[in-house]
Amino acid sequence: MTSTPTALSIAQDLLRCPSVTPADAGALDVLETLLKGAGFTVHRVTFSEPGTADIDNLYARIGNTSPHLCFAGHTDVVPPGDASAWTHGAFAGDVADGLLYGRGAVDMKGGIACAVAATLDYLAANGGQPKGSISFLITGDEEDVAVNGTVKLLQWAAERGEQFDHCIVGEPSNVETIGDTIKIGRRGSQSGVLIVDGVQGHVAYPHRAANPVPDIARLITTLNDEPLDHGSAQFQPSNLEFTSVDVGNPATNVIPAQARAKFNIRFNDHHTQETLKALVEQRLAAACGNRIRAHIEWLPSNADVFVTKPGAFTDLVGAAIAEVTGRTPELNTGGGTSDARFIAKYCQVVEFGLVGQTMHQIDERTPVSDLDKLTAIYRGVLQRYFA
């Protein structure tokens, strides 16, 4: 049997592409060459949006029947920061002391490399065809505005008649060690700006003004003090976090006309975006009474809450993890948002990849042994899925 590329070699090829969003820098070419060589039909699709950069995306599929397992992810990376601070070049793909260094090693070129390596090995051992379909849905627009990537690629695929049964997103889901966590959902995210209007005036004549600063402080305290909920079966309690307070006033002898406070809410499945906004607005109105003039400017958000209920698919992935690592993974919904929120509208989706401890950091790195383990886990998923 012909040997197939290792996850390490694929990851190194990807890391050597400096694909800081929106640049692709050849990363999708690496995947296209490998997948075409294994018999996949590969599509490259570019999406545009006014005011944003054009983004190249890749969709590849082999097989045309169900069940259909999709591997999803992104080849774009965040900027490396101070290049001189890296022990090894951010885009060199160096291995030292058993560790693979590079921007994207963990988030998430390493995970993509493992999925590709596992798939190529599975196909080579099974006559070149799955008993169903395998696809790769890869974007170059996840780390920035995320408007010309996965969300549009899914719409494009649906318009072509593509139907997914299950999906694994190779985001770095593990906290401490390979196999400790499967992400089965994510909280929603909604940001806003609390605005309190006052009346500008001289600090020596406060009776002629209305200071919004004490009022916004009271409102911040009120909105922070009462929990939005107490959590649910799969999620921790929703959390409202104020992140800045601004009055735009450089003077010390002028009462400002307005005060603004930015905030973000990470919310669970007790809420939708609309019911959440209504709840916060209701509490704000009660706190303002008839005296304080305040309102909220809600910022656009496409980060809805989602959860894949534990069941046959999570059990299958968990069994593959246990076989390789001996661990029973925790089913978790913590952390920030990811493109899985878009995929959840089309099929059941979980996130399982490498350990996330060094993602976005200087000297981002992963043990080569973790690449081998993750490849073996994905290989076990494929074997079980198409049994």
Swiss-Prot record:
Enzyme Commission number(s): 3.5.1.18
Essential cofactor(s): Zn(2+); Co(2+)
Binding positions for Zn(2+) 1 per the UniProt entry: H74, D107, E171
Keywords assigned: Amino-acid biosynthesis, Cobalt, Diaminopimelate biosynthesis, Hydrolase, Lysine biosynthesis, Metal-binding, Zinc
Record's cofactor remark: Binds 2 Zn(2+) or Co(2+) ions per subunit.
Record carries keyword Zinc: yes
GO molecular function: acetylornithine deacetylase activity; cobalt ion binding; succinyl-diaminopimelate desuccinylase activity; zinc ion binding
Metabolic or biological pathway: Amino-acid biosynthesis; L-lysine biosynthesis via DAP pathway; LL-2,6-diaminopimelate from (S)-tetrahydrodipicolinate (succinylase route): step 3/3
Reaction equation(s) it catalyzes: N-succinyl-(2S,6S)-2,6-diaminopimelate + H2O = (2S,6S)-2,6-diaminopimelate + succinate
Residues of the active site: D76, E142 (proton acceptor)
Pfam families, per the entry: M20_dimer (PF07687), Peptidase_M20 (PF01546)
Keyword presence, Metal-binding: yes
InterPro entries hit by this protein: Bact_exopeptidase_dim_dom, DapE_proteobac, Peptidase_M20, Peptidase_M20_dimer, Peptidase_M20A
Residues reported in the UniProt entry to bind Zn(2+) 2: D107, E143, H360
Single GO biological process annotation from the record: lysine biosynthetic process via diaminopimelate
Quaternary structure, from the entry: Homodimer.
Function summary: Catalyzes the hydrolysis of N-succinyl-L,L-diaminopimelic acid (SDAP), forming succinate and LL-2,6-diaminopimelate (DAP), an intermediate involved in the bacterial biosynthesis of lysine and meso-diaminopimelic acid, an essential component of bacterial cell walls.
Family the entry assigns: Belongs to the peptidase M20A family. DapE subfamily.
Name of the featured protein: Succinyl-diaminopimelate desuccinylase
Organism of origin: Rhodopseudomonas palustris (strain TIE-1)
